[in-house]
């Protein structure tokens, strides 16, 4: 196992905001063969989650080779094996690995994704990706725009407003808003009940809790939250208080950005507004295709699985991927079990 960072769980340790907790209940966020401590809270704070991962590594004696960057992996047809070239980042010494099996577990979050917007490079204020955002404490009194309405974007907007920033958020696409209690119920019920029935329940209850949000710029997708997650990997937003601040006008909602000039952002319908800073909560992208050769049996041009979940994890010639299906920790655990069982069944010394 090679890892380019100097620690495990570098995203959680170094590239997450201070108030982050797991958005799903702990029973849906466990890795194989190890539960959380019995006294752990239902929704795990990030520091406790990192501790869980540290304990997992220690318990199963996992020994990653840190600060080792993969440069290329290719399949040798003649030798029927994978050849991987890596480099130790501390010494620049090259290392070669030969293996019968290769597991791509570099994640969906390998690189920040910031969309191309006309004029962005000339923006007069600070522009950061959500991976660099820590707290709204330094933004008090500033006009801040959050781009992206997933869980990170909505929670960052709430954090900014709570610290006194004049906060706006760009909501470009339909999105489901639910409570953490509702999504926990839904994920429990769907194990025994058809997904369309559970989705109907979730939508009805969410409408009861939040009311009609379309007048505030938030429109629900046509597909239900669980089916949408299963089909596209897009998660429902679990409200932490953002909706209330949108309703009372504390957080302003805008549509798509047309262009930026100086510190002025022009939105669709020619609406313009000045901002001091912009936070892009626009997700991440896979970089697997930059180093994986002969992976076309498994990954598309974006470095994500070609096949739909749950048949996405296996390619040709002993190639596998884990954690690329946009299914969170539960999906990672499923991938790990499927891959381990498949390797075990096909391994003949």
Label every PLM stretch briefly.
Residues 35-41:
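A short acidic, helix-capping loop that chelates divalent metal ions and anchors anionic groups
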Residues 7-35, 56-59, 63:
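Redox-cofactor-proximal catalytic regions of oxidoreductases
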Residues 1-11, 41-151, 155-349:
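Flavin (primarily FAD) cofactor-binding/catalytic cores of flavoenzymes
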């Amino acid at each position: 196992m090679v890892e380019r960072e100097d620690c495990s769980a570098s995203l959680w340790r170094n590239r997450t905001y201070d108030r982050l907790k797991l958005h799903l209940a702990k029973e849906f966020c466990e890795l194989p063969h190890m539960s959380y401590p019995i006294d752990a809270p239902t929704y795990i704070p990030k520091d406790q989650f990192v501790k869980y991962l540290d304990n997992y590594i220690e318990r199963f004696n996992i020994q990653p080779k840190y600060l080792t960057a993969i440069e290329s992996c290719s399949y040798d047809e003649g030798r029927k094996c994978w050849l991987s070239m890596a480099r130790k980042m501390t010494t620049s010494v090259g290392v070669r690995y030969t293996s019968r099996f290769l597991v791509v577990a570099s994640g969906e979050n390998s690189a920040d994704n910031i969309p191309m917007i006309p004029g962005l490079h000339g923006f007069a204020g600070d522009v950061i990706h959500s991976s660099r955002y820590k707290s709204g404490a330094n933004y008090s009194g500033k006009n801040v725009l959050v781009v992206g309405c997933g869980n990170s974007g909505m929670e960052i907007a709430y954090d900014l407003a709570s610290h006194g920033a004049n906060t706006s958020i760009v909501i470009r696409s339909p999105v489901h808003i639910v409570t953490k209690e509702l999504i926990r119920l839904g994920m429990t019920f769907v194990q025994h009940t058809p997904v369309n029935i559970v989705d109907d329940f979730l939508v009805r209850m969410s409408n009861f809790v939040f009311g009609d949000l379309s007048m505030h710029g938030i429109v629900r997708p046509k597909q239900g939250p669980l089916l949408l997650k299963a089909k596209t990997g897009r998660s429902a937003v679990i409200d932490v208080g953002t909706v209330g601040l949108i309703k009372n006008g504390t957080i302003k909602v805008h549509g798509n950005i047309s262009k930026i000039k100086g510190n002025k952002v022009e939105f669709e319908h020619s609406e313009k507004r000045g901002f001091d800073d912009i936070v892009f909560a626009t997700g991440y992208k896979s970089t697997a295709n930059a180093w994986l050769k002969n992976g076309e049996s498994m990954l598309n041009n974006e470095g994500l699985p070609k096949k739909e979940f749950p048949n996405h994890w296996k390619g040709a010639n002993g190639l596998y991927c884990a954690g690329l299906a946009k299914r969170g920790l539960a999906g990672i655990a499923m991938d790990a079990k499927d891959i381990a069982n498949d390797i075990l069944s096909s391994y003949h010394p």
